[in-house]
Structures are given as C-alpha cells and as structure tokens.
C-alpha cells in the first residue's frame, strides 16, 4: 500500500467520524413580539395630560394645585426623549431625598413657631387683662401706680405686654412664610415624584397601564 492510498483512507475515515456527530441547534425560547410605541402616540398622550395641567386653578385647593403640577410632570416625562428621561429620573431621585429632608425641617420650624405664638398669646392676654382691670378697679390701679411701690410691677406688666405682642406678630409673619415654603416644597415633591414614576413605567399603548402606577406627592 502506497502513501497516497493511506492518506486518502485516513481522510475518508475522519470525514465519516465528523458526519456521525449530530447537529444540536441552540434552544429556542418563544417570546411575544414587543409593541413599539410611536412618537406620535407619546405626543398625543402628552398633550392630553397637559390639557389637564393647563386648566384653570382659580379657587383650587393645595391638593388640586399639586395634582395639576403632577399632570404637568407626567406630560413632560412623555414628551422627553429616552436618554433625557433617564437622566432626569436619576437627578429627580436624589433631589427628592433632599426635598423631603427640607420638608421635615420646615414642619419642625412651624411647630416651634406655633408653640411660641401660643405662649406669647397667653402672656399678652394675661397682661392686657391686668391692665384692663387696673382701669376699672382702683385698688389694682394703686398697686400698679407709677408713683409708689408698684412702679416696677406696672412697668413689668406693660413691658411684657409690648414684648409678647411684638413677638406674636413677628412669629405669625414668619409662620406664614414657612407655610408658603411648605406648600411650594410639597408641590415640588409631587412634580418630581410624578416624573420619576412616569419615567420608570413602560407603556404598551394602554392608558390604564400607563397611569396605574403614577405617584403624586408623598
């Protein structure tokens, strides 16, 4: 047997071995086709929600104003492209934590102001009552007279009355500003929370699925 016949026999043997190996196709996992949402559908949905946000808010309560702000945030989330939406979502999550901490501090400040106003109001009422009784009752007027031993008592009563009245007015003015800041912060929280929840959802064309998990406020 020559070398050529041996080589040919070896090659045919290898081909037979390779042909015996069965072909195993990769596993197939059937999946439902994804429904693509067109940009026109998103814009139509955004305009519909924006109409709710643009309605008149005259005479509306704080909750209704927060709702309109949430509608505007959802419309903005639907209008933004996907990369911008993801960036805003990440930034909004971090901002929400800071806003909630600030809101807790404002509420504590409001509680302290209420306590100060309560104390000042009671002291003002008491000193005003003593001053009014001194006008009616001559004995009290003698004790609170400016010319005599009751001079320091009268000055103390009138000084406390003036001081507590001033503190009451100042605390009331500061409390109004704090209430406005709380309302504005709650509205900002509602807007960002609505944007984050809207940016997290995936929409398949069904408005019920889209709006089911939207959160508004805390």
Swiss-Prot record:
Coiled coil: none annotated. It comes from the Viruses. Belongs to the orbivirus NS3 family. May play a role in the release of virions from infected cells. This is Non-structural protein NS3. It comes from African horse sickness virus 8.
């Amino acid at each position: 047997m020559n070398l050529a016949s041996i080589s040919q026999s070896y090659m045919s043997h290898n081909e037979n071995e390779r042909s015996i190996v069965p072909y195993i196709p990769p596993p197939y996992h059937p999946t439902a086709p994804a429904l693509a949402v067109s940009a026109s559908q998103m814009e139509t949905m955004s305009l519909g929600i924006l109409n709710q946000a643009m309605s008149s808010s005259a005479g509306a309560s704080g909750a209704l104003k927060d709702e309109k702000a949430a509608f505007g945030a959802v419309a903005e989330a639907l209008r933004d492209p996907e990369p911008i939406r993801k960036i805003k979502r990440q930034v909004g999550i971090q901002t929400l934590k800071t806003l909630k901490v600030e809101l807790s501090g404002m509420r504590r400040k409001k509680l302290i102001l209420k306590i100060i106003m309560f104390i000042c109001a009671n002291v003002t009422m008491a000193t005003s009552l003593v001053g009014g009784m001194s006008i009616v009752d001559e004995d009290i007027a003698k004790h609170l007279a400016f010319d005599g031993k009751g001079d320091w008592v009268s000055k103390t009563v009138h000084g406390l009355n003036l001081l507590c009245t001033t503190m009451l007015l100042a605390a009331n003015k500061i409390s109004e500003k704090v209430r406005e800041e709380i309302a504005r912060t709650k509205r900002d929280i509602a807007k960002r929370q609505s944007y984050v929840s809207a940016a997290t959802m995936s929409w398949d064309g069904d408005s019920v699925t889209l709006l089911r998990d939207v959160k508004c406020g805390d």
